[in-house]
Regions:
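Non-catalytic, mobile gating and regulatory segments of ester bond hydrolases
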Residues: 94, 99-100, 172-175
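Short amphipathic beta-strand starts and helix->beta connectors
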Residues: 95-98, 138-143
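Conserved PLP-binding catalytic core of the aspartate aminotransferase-like
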Residues: 101-136
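PLP-dependent enzyme catalytic core of the Aspartate aminotransferase-like
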Residues: 146-190
Length: 190
C-alpha cells in the first residue's frame, strides 16, 4: 500500500499486507554469523528475515493509528471530495479557450496544455508550455506539475492534499485563465 497518495498520510508511510509470511522469508532471509537467527520455535518475528531493513520502523502504525482515531468514513469522505474536485477542475479547465486536454481524469489527476491556434505540436509547443507552467506556478499558491505523454509536454493537476477544497480549485482555474489571456495577447510568449 502507498497510503501517502490517497489517504493523506506522510511519505514513507506504508504497509505490506502478506498472506503467507514464508514468502517474505524466502526472499529476504540470509545466513551470516553476525545475524544469528532466533530460536526456531520462538514466536518472535525476526525482522531481518522478512525485510530488506534490519530493524523495524513500524510504518504500519502510521496507517493504523489515523484509521483507529478517525475511522474509515473520514478517509472515504476526504478521498471522495478530492475525486469530485478533480472532475470539477477538469470541467473548468476543459472549458477554457486554447486549452487542450491530453489525459482525462484518472482518479485525482488529469493533464492539459496551452495550445494556441498557430502552434503545431513539437519542441516549440513544449517549450511554450514549460513557460506557461512556470507562470501558473509563480504565485506559489498551488503547485501544478508536469509530465510527458509521448513527446508532448503536459501540465498536470493532481488533487490530493487534504486541505484542498473547491475555493482552491477555483483559484487555480482562475490563474490558468489569467495566464492563458497573457499568453494569448502576447505578453508572456516571447
Amino acid at each position: 500500500m502507498e497510503p501517502h497518495k490517497g489517504l493523506f498520510l506522510p511519505y514513507g508511510t506504508g504497509c505490506l499486507l502478506v498472506k503467507n509470511a514464508c514468502h517474505l522469508e524466502q526472499a529476504h532471509k540470509v545466513a551470516a554469523k553476525y545475524l544469528p537467527p532466533f530460536q526456531e520455535e520462538s514466536d518472535r518475528i525476526d525482522f531481518c528475515g522478512i525485510s530488506p531493513e534490519l530493524s523495524r520502523d513500524f510504518r504500519g502504525l502510521r496507517v493504523w493509528l489515523p484509521f483507529k482515531l478517525f475511522g474509515t468514513q473520514t478517509f472515504a469522505a476526504y478521498l471522495d471530495e478530492k475525486l469530485d474536485l478533480c472532475q470539477y477542475a477538469f470541467k473548468q479547465i476543459q472549458a477554457l479557450e486554447q486549452i487542450e486536454i491530453l489525459a482525462e481524469p484518472t482518479l485525482s489527476t488529469f493533464a492539459f496544455r496551452y495550445r494556441p491556434r498557430d502552434c503545431s505540436p513539437g519542441d516549440e509547443l513544449n517549450s511554450l508550455n514549460q513557460r506557461f507552467l512556470t507562470e501558473v506556478n509563480r504565485t506559489k499558491r498551488f503547485l501544478l506539475s508536469a509530465t510527458y505523454l509521448g513527446d508532448e509536454f503536459t501540465i498536470r493537476i493532481c488533487v490530493l492534499a487534504f486541505r484542498t477544497h473547491q475555493r482552491h480549485i477555483d483559484d487555480c482555474v482562475e490563474e490558468v485563465r489569467r495566464v492563458t489571456r497573457l499568453f494569448n495577447d502576447g505578453s508572456l510568449t516571447n
